[in-house]
From Swiss-Prot:
<keyword id="KW-0029">Amino-acid transport</keyword>
<comment type="similarity">
    <text>Belongs to the amino acid-polyamine-organocation (APC) superfamily. L-type amino acid transporter (LAT) (TC 2.A.3.8) family.</text>
</comment>
<dbReference type="GO" id="GO:0140924">
    <property type="term" value="P:L-kynurenine transmembrane transport"/>
</dbReference>
<dbReference type="GO" id="GO:0005886">
    <property type="term" value="C:plasma membrane"/>
</dbReference>
<feature type="topological domain" description="Extracellular">
    <location>
        <begin position="386"/>
        <end position="387"/>
    </location>
</feature>
<feature type="topological domain" description="Extracellular">
    <location>
        <begin position="287"/>
        <end position="317"/>
    </location>
</feature>
<keyword id="KW-0597">Phosphoprotein</keyword>
<feature type="topological domain" description="Extracellular">
    <location>
        <begin position="65"/>
        <end position="74"/>
    </location>
</feature>
<feature type="transmembrane region" description="Helical">
    <location>
        <begin position="423"/>
        <end position="443"/>
    </location>
</feature>
<feature type="topological domain" description="Cytoplasmic">
    <location>
        <begin position="339"/>
        <end position="364"/>
    </location>
</feature>
<dbReference type="GO" id="GO:0015327">
    <property type="term" value="F:cystine:glutamate antiporter activity"/>
</dbReference>
<comment type="subunit">
    <text>Disulfide-linked heterodimer with the amino acid transport protein SLC3A2/4F2hc; this interaction mediates cell membrane localization.</text>
</comment>
<feature type="binding site">
    <location>
        <position position="244"/>
    </location>
    <ligand>
        <name>L-glutamate</name>
    </ligand>
</feature>
<feature type="topological domain" description="Cytoplasmic">
    <location>
        <begin position="96"/>
        <end position="101"/>
    </location>
</feature>
<dbReference type="GO" id="GO:0015813">
    <property type="term" value="P:L-glutamate transmembrane transport"/>
</dbReference>
<dbReference type="GO" id="GO:0031528">
    <property type="term" value="C:microvillus membrane"/>
</dbReference>
<dbReference type="InterPro" id="IPR050598">
    <property type="entry name" value="AminoAcid_Transporter"/>
</dbReference>
Amino acid sequence: MVRKPVVSTISKGGYLQGNVNGRLPSLGNKEPPGQEKVQLKRKVTLLRGVSIIIGTIIGAGIFISPKGVLQNTGSVGMSLTIWTVCGVLSLFGALSYAELGTTIKKSGGHYTYILEVFGPLPAFVRVWVELLIIRPAATAVISLAFGRYILEPFFIQCEIPELAIKLITAVGITVVMVLNSMSVSWSARIQIFLTFCKLTAILIIIVPGVMQLIKGQTQNFKDAFSGRDSSITRLPLAFYYGMYAYAGWFYLNFVTEEVENPEKTIPLAICISMAIVTIGYVLTNVAYFTTINAEELLLSNAVAVTFSERLLGNFSLAVPIFVALSCFGSMNGGVFAVSRLFYVASREGHLPEILSMIHVRKHTPLPAVIVLHPLTMIMLFSGDLDSLLNFLSFARWLFIGLAVAGLIYLRYKCPDMHRPFKVPLFIPALFSFTCLFMVALSLYSDPFSTGIGSVITLTGVPAYYLFIIWDKKPRWFRIMSEKITRTLQIILEVVPEEDKL
């Protein structure tokens, strides 16, 4: 099922085109670097796919403050139950995306699936709010955690200056952008290494926890389902925190066109990753409770540090480094995946054409990567990022739910579509209901923030009609746009992709 772009995304004469040697015609007469076509290569193997999913799901939260679930359940047993249920439901969502990714073999994730099923307007609104607010703010938040924890070993006895955190954060963001601009292979290799660091950090917590259980340290699990008074009405909020902790399983679908043998790799990578993350999350929480009781966990600002100080002695000094590496992995994986979302949206005519162009030698979507840098820097040095993300958290579940509902629609509308991987219908149905529940919960628990988020999201509607539908733009605007694009092509050494889908 292939759509035509909403508008023409690549000029037939106005913009510079790459030649068969993979170079811009205006870059001189040097010997061409090779005969490869200018296009994104399929370099994402099974191992790299697993590292993208695990690397973007596991951030700082499980090490620093996994208390949102416990706070709203009131008992150790119920919190572990919620962690398990959320892992299973996230697996259902991931399996639904595996079917979508092997049926619609295009990059872009939920943007592409919404575009294919529901049309250009909701797809544009999705990418509009993602580009301008959600992704820059989310990248800035995880990057600030990286900056704080990479500096913590140097400021053990005093408070870390806020300016120092932001400066080292800015350096980290720049390194990630440069890395993703220079090489897909190196970005993927570093992601594998960082994922290994994350899993090592989790094992450093789980193994001593298991040893504590063997020694009989089970006092915090006695009467596991009794504890602080907690209303059953707060369980949905605990569920919300749990689902948020697993978010990230959808990122491999953002890079479908770069996955080797996607019909096999995507489902297998998703199943392996979700099994590892779910087991890791549950066992990490079990390990915490072998040493820290519920009240202490709720009071701790860095649970992994508290745990390691009690069991690992001086080795606890290494925990901030592992947390920083975990954050860096989330930064790298997020930028790698989301840049492909912008690339595909540009190819479909929803973003400026320059974002759908590829570097002539490095074969990376350079403009789609670097566009995030100034936007993230603005967010980094601006106001309250957490509030901004809270305003828009409902939008994530709304659009993911729409994408999975689209799977159900395609089952009935296009029953003969080739589906290499097919899930039982109750899986997408249950997950779509879960997403609807998350949106309803946002409206119920915080109507003010959700209302602000709705207004911000809906600004994409007039933007769609102004920038996409209105085709009688002034001549001076079209000329200026073309000149800017040509200039950026020459500076960045990028051209339209050859043999696009």
